[in-house]
Amino acid sequence: MRKMYLSAPLPFVGQKRMLAKEFMKVLEQYPDGTLFVDLFGGSGLLSHITKSLKPHSTVIYNDFDNYRFRMKHIPQTNQLLADIREMVGNSVPRHKIIKGELRERIFSRIEQEENSTGYVDFITLSSSILFSMKYKLSVQDMRKEALYNNIRKTGYPECTDYLEGLEIVSCDYKEVFNRNKDIPGVVFLVDPPYLSTDVGTYNMYWNMADYLDVLNVLKGHSYVYFTSNKSSILELCEWIGKNRDLGNPFENCTKVEFNAHMNYNSSYTDMMLYKKEAA
């Protein structure tokens, strides 16, 4: 029997380890042999659990964020973390800020890794040297943050069997959906980036329309959909359900935009919309 992991081998924003056991209960409703399509594959945890419990099922894992590439580089990432761990030693207590010359040495080592190999797993690295749940994707962005000694005491296991048996694709979720939507009994696993949360580590830009487009895949299909109380998507859908005749109140209006700057690296766009109804 294959080993089943209840958390992803490498850090990933929004992996569903806290819901793993509840998700397993949902899977019990479906026979082995059902087609499962993980539209937003993320860390692959949902796909992995599904394949572990339903070994005769086809499980399609949409690895749009290239998680498998990060896993392939675990030995390289472990070596980089080991070098940083040795640099820090006992000079900085756990979870305290890394400052001064040591901070610069760490950045130099990361830059050396990127220049010599062409790759650094910045998400995994962020979890070891940035404040909890902060993730940056370049040395340039990391330099804007304080470094912390959150470095793992041991390397990450390679988990070579984690994605075993999955049918792996890497494309827009709409394309994956359209390929499989007419297959009888298909179950869609739908775990999009959450509305009103940071999507900076995802490989695509998301706006409000993108979040709402996802809801199209739910109608008429079996699904397991994930969200959180940090997202307002359920509240929005409930409101729309109660106000079905509203339509678009901003249709044919005029929009004026103004770029507002809060500080040197933060800005937003103020908008004014107006329309004069005929008398």
Stretches found by the model and what they are:
Residues 38-50, 61-65, 127-132, 182-198:
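Conserved proline-anchored active-site loop of SAM-dependent methyltransferases
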Residues 28, 50-58, 181-185, 216, ...:
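Short, surface-exposed basic-aromatic patches at helix termini and helix-loop junctions that form
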Residues 57-163, 276-279:
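Class I S-adenosyl-L-methionine-dependent methyltransferase module
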Residues 148-153, 204-214:
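Well-ordered, non-membrane alpha-helical segments in soluble/globular domains
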Residues 46-52, 70-73, 180, 197-203, ...:
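A short acidic (Asp/Glu
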Residues 208-279:
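Long, positively charged, glycine-interspersed low-complexity recognition regions
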Residues 1-35, 45:
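S-adenosyl-L-methionine
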Residues 165-211:
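Active-site segment flanking the S-adenosylmethionine/decSAM binding pocket
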